[in-house]
Amino acid sequence: MYERYQLVLHSRQFEDIRRSFLNGRAAHAYIIEGPAGAGKRTLSKLASALIVCREKRACLDCPDCRRALLGVHPDVHLYSSEKRISVKDMRGLIEQSALKPYEADYGVYIVENAHTATAEAQNCLLKTLEEPPGDSIFMLLALNAGQLLPTVRSRCRLVRMTGFSDELIFRQLQALYPGEEKCRQAAQMAGGNIGRGVALIEKRELWELAALAERLCAEADSLSAAQAAEMLRGAKDRMDELLPLLEERLIRAGDVKSLARLGYVEDAVRRLEENVNPALALDGLAYYFTKGDSKWQKL
């Protein structure tokens, strides 16, 4: 059960939180920032285990730690919404946080996708952050802390989940999937994101997209624009997954040609976000990706 937590358990981010609690300098509210799959929820679970652990160290062995990790501890509360977090949602959290913890010294309140909270909901929470209950700790998980109100950010301690090294992700994948031959390659293609590494192992479709990204980059000098366009069109409905994989592969290569092609991919992402016709955007990417002409970036 605990193999999945080892990477984040030994991370600098968790160590900083652990040390702050041991030294009596814990914050009453944290913003844990990072892309999907970066380990935000795992960090919040481990921090919760640390807070309720009867050994005060996130031993992962005592009943309190186990219940916190399983999401069944009465003093650890996870708030998640498929839609934007509303004032009503936030008021429910605030009312719960006003109650005394059942067993632990603190109640822990984890808000997933906090960046989706409406301005009204954030202002509702702000009053609690300004005068926090002494026995409550809040953890706001967000893709980008900049999407939260400045007044909310100023009352929280920011923890950034940055990328892990390929080697650390490889070891984590090996622990999770003993004997799996794809662990090394998945770690290299994960781009520092453990969630993506896991998805590459578990989801055949994503692995095939990663293989397509590898082929496009490896054969870019010999492919014709028509061949590259055909390859891209075959994945036209999954560009939101393929283009980041292409970017990671080009960054990993790091040579002059790859970095130039990275610019073309970034331009394609921008064009798609601006609702340019997808077929035109992909055909343009295929042409400049294989020809290496910089004019497209100036259009």
Describe the residue ranges of each PLM region.
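Conserved adenine-binding aromatic site and its adjacent loop/helix in ATP-hydrolyzing domains
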Residues: 95, 127, 150, 154
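Charged, glycine-rich active-site and insertion segments that engage polyanionic ligands
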Residues: 1-49, 64-67, 134-137, 143-299
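Clamp-loader machinery-focused feature within the broader ASCE/P-loop NTPase space
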Residues: 1-120
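Conserved catalytic/switch belt of AAA+ P-loop NTPases
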Residues: 98, 123-140
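Catalytic acidic motif of RecA-like/P-loop NTPases
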Residues: 112-118, 123-126, 130, 146
